[in-house]
Regions:
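Residues forming the flavin
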Residues: 1-181
Length: 181
């Protein structure tokens, strides 16, 4: 509104939607030991969307955050070794750019976050294998998992019920690409 008032052209019709990915720290140690926060960008040949890593936390924890009643996640990493975990976490964000007539990309992102909250009662967690098998993660499989999530309050669920297919397909492609790197 301020830009309109001042006659300044502006454009804000993009939103980043994604997940916080958590895995054993030793997997990323060859990178995070050299570069604390690696910035990796992937363009999906299938969806043509960009996906990027963001806010990498070696030996860190996933935490819940409440923003205007919407529960989302963030990651923290601490210098003090007594707060270190066995996991590294980072966001995988897919950028979506919208065209006319759609104008409210922020509301779209909030809608997806609200939908995830509705399905899980807060933060949702899903094992990658369950995501690929198109099945909801349950507490039993999560407890038997190779990676133990640092946010124990996260509710097992199925991200495919909350995230748009294009977003999820791009994230899955990037995870496979990272695995080959």
């Amino acid at each position: 509104q301020m830009c309109d008032k001042l006659g300044i052209m502006s454009q804000n019709n993009r939103v980043d939607i994604g997940v916080r990915f958590e895995c054993h720290a030793e997997i990323w140690a060859p990178i995070t030991d050299m570069i604390y926060e690696a910035k990796i960008i992937y363009r999906s040949p299938k969806t043509r969307c960009l996906c990027r890593t963001f806010c990498m936390n070696p030996n860190g924890s996933v935490v819940a955050e409440n923003t205007n009643g919407i529960i989302t996640v963030n990651g923290h990493s601490y210098k003090d070794p007594k707060f270190h975990t066995q996991n590294t976490n980072f966001a995988l964000l897919v950028t979506h750019r919208f065209t006319e007539p759609f104008k409210d990309s922020n509301a779209y992102g909030e809608y997806i976050a609200n939908l995830t909250n509705m399905l899980s009662g807060g933060v949702m967690v899903q094992r990658f294998g369950d995501l690929i098998d198109n099945r909801r993660t349950n507490r039993k499989r999560l407890n038997e998992s190779f990676v133990h999530p640092t946010l124990s309050a996260a509710e097992p669920g199925n991200l495919a019920l909350a995230l748009p297919k294009q977003t999820l397909d791009t994230i899955i492609e990037m995870i496979y690409a990272l695995d080959k790197a």
